[in-house]
Swiss-Prot record:
<keyword id="KW-0448">Lipopolysaccharide biosynthesis</keyword>
<protein>
    <recommendedName>
        <fullName>dTDP-rhamnosyl transferase RfbF</fullName>
        <ecNumber>2.4.-.-</ecNumber>
    </recommendedName>
</protein>
<keyword id="KW-0808">Transferase</keyword>
<dbReference type="InterPro" id="IPR029044">
    <property type="entry name" value="Nucleotide-diphossugar_trans"/>
</dbReference>
<dbReference type="GO" id="GO:0009103">
    <property type="term" value="P:lipopolysaccharide biosynthetic process"/>
</dbReference>
<dbReference type="Pfam" id="PF00535">
    <property type="entry name" value="Glycos_transf_2"/>
</dbReference>
<comment type="similarity">
    <text>Belongs to the glycosyltransferase 2 family.</text>
</comment>
<dbReference type="InterPro" id="IPR001173">
    <property type="entry name" value="Glyco_trans_2-like"/>
</dbReference>
<dbReference type="InterPro" id="IPR006446">
    <property type="entry name" value="RhaTrfase"/>
</dbReference>
<dbReference type="GO" id="GO:0016757">
    <property type="term" value="F:glycosyltransferase activity"/>
</dbReference>
<keyword id="KW-0328">Glycosyltransferase</keyword>
<comment type="pathway">
    <text>Bacterial outer membrane biogenesis; lipopolysaccharide biosynthesis.</text>
</comment>
Length: 296
């Protein structure tokens, strides 16, 4: 067992086949596994693969991705983790994924490193979205054989972090509950001069969003109305954070309105999306944080 690398997986009503496959892959790659469960509707302990080698933390209610990750981080650090890697419940990794990331970090003295992502359905690379200090976004398109590069942000799944980063930057922001958690934390790292190393030779299959629709050339992720609430509200909360570029925060507020308008125009439960957007806007302006109205 590689005792200094811990994997933190946050679950919420997971598809057991995918989750168990990920756990098996991590165990085969000599990684300790910590599962933090956000109130799954069935007893997870009896259904996990190799449960005696998995540390399962069951929360009494949905505490959100940020708090669940923090609980997993603290447990891992208490057990002596030197590096922590995060995964979604439906993530899948290839052979030597953990070893390659860890070796790269050691060889290049990188504090944070992550893979590139391949769309599960369309089999193309997702571009990496780099956010500059002035708030402008830059899409970095990944090509086969590309050399490693640095980015200000990445998604949490598949990202490996050295323990000292948490000592310098702090934990995930529990005020945000779910959306923008990884973006805000990465921008906090950027504020301390810590960038994410992206390694194109290390790949991970990923699916973003429940589904999406393409309107006027724009891919709009279609989440539930409640999930849209957090997306919209948190865009306003970003305006309150000094390390988040103002231009980025304004962009997210504007785009949240555009996206909601397009979702209302194309989806059946229009009234529910409209209500959630109005409530999210009001709560965001008032500074309502955490799970707010809907954590249970």
């Amino acid at each position: 067992m590689n005792s200094n690398i811990y994997a933190v997986i946050v679950t919420y009503n997971p598809e057991l086949k995918n989750l168990n496959a990920l756990i098996t892959e991590l165990k085969e790659q000599n990684c300790y596994v910590v599962v933090v469960d956000n109130r799954t509707n069935f007893t997870l302990k009896d259904k996990l693969a190799d449960i005696e080698k998995v540390h399962l933390i069951c929360l009494g209610r949905n505490e959100g991705i940020a708090k669940a990750q923090n609980i997993g981080i603290r447990y891992s650090l208490e057990k002596g983790a030197e590096k922590i890697i995060f995964f979604d419940q439906d993530s899948r990794i290839r052979n030597e994924f953990i070893k390659k990331l860890s070796c790269y970090m050691d060889n290049e003295n990188a504090k944070i490193a992550g893979p590139v992502f391949i769309d599960r359905d369309k089999s193309h690379y997702y571009p990496i979205c780099n956010i500059k200090k002035n708030g402008l976004r830059e899409k970095i398109h990944v090509t086969e054989g590309q050399t490693p590069f640095k980015s200000s942000v990445t998604i949490s799944s598949g990202t490996m972090v050295s323990k000292e980063v948490f000592e310098i930057v702090g934990m995930m922001d529990e005020e945000l509950f779910i959306d923008y958690v990884d973006t805000e934390w990465c921008l906090r790292c950027l504020n301390y001069g810590i960038l994410v190393h992206i390694i194109p030779d290390i790949k991970m299959v990923h699916a973003i969003g429940d589904k999406s629709v393409k309107i006027c050339g724009i891919n709009i992720p279609i989440h539930s109305p409640v999930r849209r609430y957090y997306r919209v509200r948190n865009a306003f909360l970003l305006l309150r954070k000094n390390h988040v570029p103002l231009l980025l925060s304004i962009r997210e507020v504007v785009f949240s309105l555009i996206h909601t308008t397009l979702i209302i125009a194309t989806q059946k439960n229009k009234i529910e999306y409209m209500k959630k957007h109005i409530l999210a806007t009001l709560d965001g302006i008032r500074g309502i944080t955490g799970g707010g109205r809907y954590n249970a």
